[in-house]
Amino acid sequence: MIAAVAAGCGGAQSSDVAKDRIETVGVEQFAELMTRKDVRLIDVRTPKEYAEGHLEGSENIDVKATDFAEHIKDIKGTVAVYCRSGKRSLTAAVQLSTNGCSVYNLDGGILAWQKAGRKTTTIETDIFSTRNGKLVKIHALMHACIRIEYDGREIEVDPCANLNGRTVDYSAFPKADIILVTHDHFDHFDTATINMLSTEKTLLVMNRACAEKMDGKRMDNGDKLSVGTDISIEAVPAYNTTKGHQQFHPKKRDNGYILCLDGLRIYMAGDTEDIPEMSKVKNIDIAFLPCNQPYTMTPEQLVRAAKIVKPKVLFPYHYSETDVTGIAEQLPDIDVRIRHYE
């Protein structure tokens, strides 16, 4: 256990009890912790440092940010933290342990990790908790490609390995338990990647156009599907409304999806504009809304859509070269997160 350090914030736990919840561990033990589905991995460095390379599956919460305490107040359970050398993460560990978490701190930080020959990644990760405390990790791959880890299961959305010079090495990921495909355009429907990710047990969900080209579970707008007791999938409309654009995504052909994981509701809108049917999309925790004309929405349309859906967290995606940096200031009541979904 660590030596006494000054507590970084107040809390119900005494400082001595909080310190007993912290353990500083080496690279090998930290790597083992990263394989556990109940451990939340946090990089407490700056966003710039995180973007340059981080441990796979880690989310970024800057311990030096003024809102750090706000960001961690609802985090429970077991947490593994790291920084550059281990000092900032120790400060973060104290605050997390004061909140009741059991915390493991990486001795020597990412420098020790790299010295040991361990790999890092630039794929951004956001972590959420379900109603029963299960962790959901959402990895921003590119464009409309989303990887979701939930309770030991792998979910891939519109997997595409190569797009305009950007690539995703799907061979580095586990096989998929569920694959969701919104429609049959090349930047969403990559049959080679789907085949590579699939096993005989993989549930492949597609719209009608894709199901005509590849074996899978066809879902039309309005269809619902339960997967076990804790996962449900609903196909919802996704289409163009602007005059001269309707041919890109005709009404009733393509899908968006509402994926519910143990009560956590995730809306992946697919290629769509701000359509009337969005008013029926309710109680959304996390929304992915597309932003690039002429194929999907303008930033103004995206803002309108967000005000209709009212998600707690919003990820603009599929935005290519569209400037989405001004969206957050127009949606002060929504946690807007810009990730590399160009």
Give the residues covered by each predicted segment.
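Rhodanese-like catalytic fold shared by cysteine-dependent sulfurtransferases
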Residues: 1, 6-33, 47-78, 84-125
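Zn-dependent metallo-beta-lactamase
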Residues: 11, 123-151, 330-333
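Active-site-proximal loop/helix segments of hydrolase catalytic cores
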Residues: 49, 242-308, 320
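Active-site neighborhood of phospho(di)ester-bond hydrolases with catalytic His/Asp-centered motifs
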Residues: 83, 156-160, 176-187, 204-208, ...
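Metallo-beta-lactamase
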Residues: 124-135, 141, 206-264, 338-342
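Pre-active-site segment of Zn-dependent metallo-hydrolases
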Residues: 128-131, 145-184, 191-195, 242-247, ...
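Active-site HxH/HxHxD metal-binding segment of metal-dependent hydrolases
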Residues: 167-226, 234-239
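Binuclear metal-ion centers of metallo-dependent hydrolases, dominated by the metallo-beta-lactamase
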Residues: 217-228, 251, 303, 307-342
